[in-house]
Amino acid sequence: MVWYWFTARKNGKHIRERIPADSQTEAVSELEKMGYTDIVITDIVITE
């Protein structure tokens, strides 16, 4: 599994979390659909 750690804003709050996705593009797209803005991918973690 690939986890993408990100920083973003949602409802005026600064957030740092992670999201599982197959690609960085998919991760950003999903975050945008959930209402996140100012998205920056900070780390990529691959787990088995």
Features from the language model and the residues they span:
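A short, exposed loop/beta-hairpin motif centered on an aromatic-Gly-Thr core
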Residues: K13-D22
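Short, mixed-charge low-complexity intrinsically disordered segments
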Residues: K33-E48
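Residue-level signal for functionally critical sites in structured catalytic/ligand-binding pockets
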Residues: A8, Q24, I46
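Residue-level signature of catalytic and energy-coupling elements of molecular machines
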Residues: A27
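Short aromatic-glycine-(Arg/Gly/Cys) micro-motifs in beta-strand/loop hairpins
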Residues: M1-H14
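DNA-recognition helix of helix-turn-helix
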Residues: E30
